[in-house]
Amino acid sequence: MAKDSHTATHDRGLPADLSAPAFVDGWKMRALVVGVIFSLIAAGLAFADGSLDHVLRAWVLGMMLTFGWSVGGLALLMVQYCSGGKWGLLLRRPLEAMARSLPLVLVYWIVVALNLKRLYLWAQFKSDIDTTAALKVGFINELQKHCMDFKRPMLNTSMFWAVSLVCFAIWFLYAYRLTSLGLKRDADSPANTPYWIKKFENIAGPGIVVYALTMTAAVIYWVMSMDPTWFSSVYGLLFLVGQGYSVLALGIIVAIALSKAEPFKTILRQTEQHDLGKMTFAFVMLNIYLGFAQFLIIWSGNLPEEIPWYLDRIRGHWGIIITLDFIFHWLIPFSLLLSRDIKRNKKRLTLVCQWMIFAKAFDLFWLIEPNFKDAARNLHFSWGILEYVAVPVAMVSFWIAFFCTRLKARPLVQTNDPHVAEILEPEHVHA
């Protein structure tokens, strides 16, 4: 018969040293080495391919993946401040480190912004005269001309820079404000905790709305506008959910890895790990729901303005990729996270989360590459296509090194928090 037993004594407490373990420096060095190696591989592939086109396309993938962690980490931090919960005590410092890694994402974005004509069809045409000439020689079709002419007040270089920089400024402001106040909260008296809880709620509540709007604007310009004919009312929401999907995966990996030493060895209990696994499962479900709902509505509607976007990603061997995307991105994580044992097992949950990050990158490949004329409905091998491995791995590696620097800069646990005492209580398990 099952019985309750304590897994720890009542005298547990936080260790005196709350700084990140020394092995985080090892993570940083390994990430830098991997980044350099894959940068060299990317350069070699570009030489073999004879073009930088795939380098820049893969660069967008790497930028969107790291952007999702930085801005998505900021968003999840704000959600935690509004909702509360013990899980926030585990992820708060890693989420802050993600948000404070945003400067590197800005550097990545600048590379994209300086190469608009190579990545965005609309950037090649500044007026109706230009699109008319391109239509006559067969470079674009009627739908592309109509959409670019109609959307020109929005899809132009000046607006791309202006909207993007305003979004970055807002994200930087929120990241700085929330992370700096976090340090002030730790330095304050526990008696003022209710004041700090209210203050963070007042900042984070409106911040979530601002995040949703600015993130949607950013992904419309950075990814959606690669095909100027495409429009979707849930595109921003798909990326919002996708960011939650990948941020939780990375956050769990970091938390479990940190639990090999103090202070996370003390505070990461099976209960909170299980809770994080359930949250991740929820994002997996929401992710496939939105993606499939959009596909079903557009496919059944079969409108000539909408259906080509999916045909570009299904025909010409792309059907293999979309099938694998469904399996990688949803079916495998869904099936594995159904298991309670996997969610409570550190090694297995880490493997699932690592797979989810790979699946997210694979999904971004399916979203980005078919936007280009040489790839739409024509999946084929070239040296350039391998850039989708080399370039993102290098960019993610450098981002991880930057993230580790940010993580080392502050104590890993926010001590002035009412959940500290709760998370240090003995954990009850069923024997």
Q: Predicted segments — roles?
A:
Residues 3, 53-56, 63-187, 207:
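Transmembrane-helix bundle segments that line or gate the permeation/cavity pathway
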Residues 22-45, 132-136, 150-325, 342, ...:
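Long, contiguous internal "core" modules enriched in hydrophobic/ aromatic residues
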Residues 47-55, 60, 79-92, 119-121, ...:
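Juxtamembrane/interface segments at transmembrane-helix termini
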Residues 70-77, 106-111, 164-176, 241-256, ...:
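Hydrophobic cores of alpha-helical transmembrane segments in multi-pass inner/ER membrane proteins
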Residues 100-119, 282-291, 351-359:
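Hydrophobic alpha-helical membrane-insertion segments
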